Amino acid sequence: MLTLLNLLSAVALLVWGTHIVRTGVMRVFGARLRTVLSRSVEKKPLAFCAGIGVTALVQSSNATTMLVTSFVAQDLVALAPALVIVLGADVGTALMARILTFDLSWLSPLLIFIGVIFFLGRKQSRAGQLGRVGIGLGLILLALELIVQAVTPITQANGVQVIFASLTGDILLDALIGAMFAIISYSSLAAVLLTATLTAAGIISFPVALCLVIGANLGSGLLAMLNNSAANAAARRVALGSLLFKLVGSLIILPFVHLLAETMGKLSLPKAELVIYFHVFYNLVRCLAMLPFVDPMARFCKTIIRDEPELDTQLRPKHLDVSALDTPTLALANAARETLRIGDAMEQMMEGLNKVMHGEPRQEKELRKLADDINVLYTAIKLYLARMPKEELAEEESRRWAEIIEMSLNLEQASDIVERMSSEIADKSLAARRAFSLDGLKELDALYEQLLSNLKLAMSVFFSGDVTSARRLRRSKHRFRILNRRYSHAHVDRLHQQNVQSIETSSLHLGLLGDMQRLNSLFCSVAYSVLEQPDEDEGRDEY
C-alpha cells in the first residue's frame, strides 16, 4: 500500500511541477507567447513550429492548447490554424518527454536550490518567476526519478505481474488501458514513463508497450475533452479536433504494432529507450501526416459542435476564460477585453440618451436593458478578477488589475447615471409636454458630443496605456468642466431674461449639467491611472 502511495505521490509531484513551470513561464513571457501564437497562424509550417516551441517552453501541451482555445473563443484565430498549433504542441510535449527522461538527476537539486533562492528573495519580480520555473523543472526531474523508484517494487509483486501478463495480444484493450493510465495520472508523460519502466523490468512485452503509448496519447486527448466539457463551443471544437486526430492516428497505426515492434526490436537499444523514441516519432509522423487535413477537420468539428443559441438577448461575458486564471497576463487581457465591451454598451447608452433628449421616449426601455447588460458584465469581471491570486501578481499586474476594476466600476456607475437621466427627461420633460429651449438644447448637444468623444478616448487610453493620449484626455476633461460651467451661467442668464422654456425645464436642465459633469469625471479618471499623478483640481469635481 505504501509503495502504491509513493507512486501516486510521485505522479502528483510530476503534474504539480509541470503546473509550476507553466505558471512561471506564462507570468514572465505570457504576453510574448500570445504574440508569437497569434502571429504564427498565417502559415501552417510557422504555426506548427510555434506550437512545438511554445510547448517546449511551458512544458505542457495543455497550456499551449489553453492559449489557442482562448484566441479561438475570442475570434482572434480561426479553428484550422488553431488545430495546426495544437498538432505542433503534441510534437513539442513528446520531444520534451525525450529530454526529461535523460539521466538529469544531478540537475534536480541544483534547480530547486537556485529556484527557491530567487523565488523567495524576489517573489514578485521577473527573477522570482524564473526561480519558480527552476523549482518546477527540478520537481519534474525529481518526480521522474521517484516514479522509477516507486515502480520497481510494484513490478516485482506477483499479483502485478499476473495482471500485466494478461496484456498480450488484444491491441484495442491494451490501448484503452494506456488511455486509462494517462487519464488517471493526468499526464501522458507519466503514463509513457511508467510504460517504459514496466518494459525495462520485463513485466510487459514490447508490442504491449507500444499499444500503451498509443493509448496514452489518446488518453491525453480524452483528458482535454473532459477538461473543456463545460467550456464554450469554440473551446470544445479545438479539443474535439485534437482528440479526433489522435483517434485517427491510433486506428491507423494499431494494426501495424506487431510489425513495428519486430522492426524496432532489431535495434541495439534498451527496450525502455525504444519506447520513448517511439513516443516521439509516432507523434511527429502522426502530426505531420494530419497537417493537410486540418481544414476538413475544422469544418467537421463546426458541424458536430454548433454555436449555442442565445435563449435571451441579454449581453453575456464572452472573454472571461476560467482556464486562464492561473496565467495573470492572459486573464488580465481577457478582463480588459470584457471591459471594452462595457465601453461599447456605454456608447450605445450615450447615443440613446441623446435621442431621449430630442424627444424619443421609446429609447428609455432600451437604455434600461443596456444598463442591466452593463451590470451583468461588471459583476462577471469583478468575480473573475477576484478569483485571481492577487498576492502572487507582479507590481505591473497588480496595477493593471486595479485599473480594470476601477474602469469597469466607473462605467457601471455611469450607466446608472445615464439610466436615471433618461428617466428624469421622460418624466419631467416629455410626459409634461415641456421642451428645452433652443439654445439650451444646443448646449446639451455640445456637451453630449464632447462627453462621447471623451468616452471613446478614455477606452483607448484604458486599453493602450498611451501617456500622450492620457494627457490629451486630461486636458479634454478640464475643457469639458469649463464648458459645462459656461453653459450653467448661460442657462441662468436665460432665466433672468424670463425665457419660458428655460424656466419650465430649469431644474431638469441644471440636473443634466451636473450629471454630465459626473459622467465626464468617471470617464476621464483612467487618465490619472496611466499618468500616475494626482490632479490638483480633482477635489473640485463632482462624483
Swiss-Prot record:
The protein's name in its UniProt record: Putative inorganic phosphate export protein YjbB
Protein purpose: Might be involved in phosphate export.
Family the entry assigns: Belongs to the YjbB family.
Compartment(s) of residence: Cell inner membrane
Catalyzed reactions: phosphate(in) = phosphate(out)
Gene behind the chain: yjbB
Residue ranges crossing the lipid bilayer per the database entry: 1-21, 48-68, 76-96, 99-119, 134-154, 175-195, 196-216, 240-260, 274-294
InterPro entries: Na/Pi_transpt, NaPi_cotrn-rel/YqeW-like, PhoU-like_sf
Membrane topology of the entry: Multi-pass membrane protein
Organism: Escherichia coli O157:H7
GO biological processes: sodium-dependent phosphate transport
CC per GO annotation: plasma membrane
Main location: membrane
GO molecular function: sodium:phosphate symporter activity
Keyword set includes Transport: yes
Disulfide bonds, paired cysteine numbers: none
Keywords: Cell inner membrane, Cell membrane, Membrane, Phosphate transport, Transmembrane, Transmembrane helix, Transport
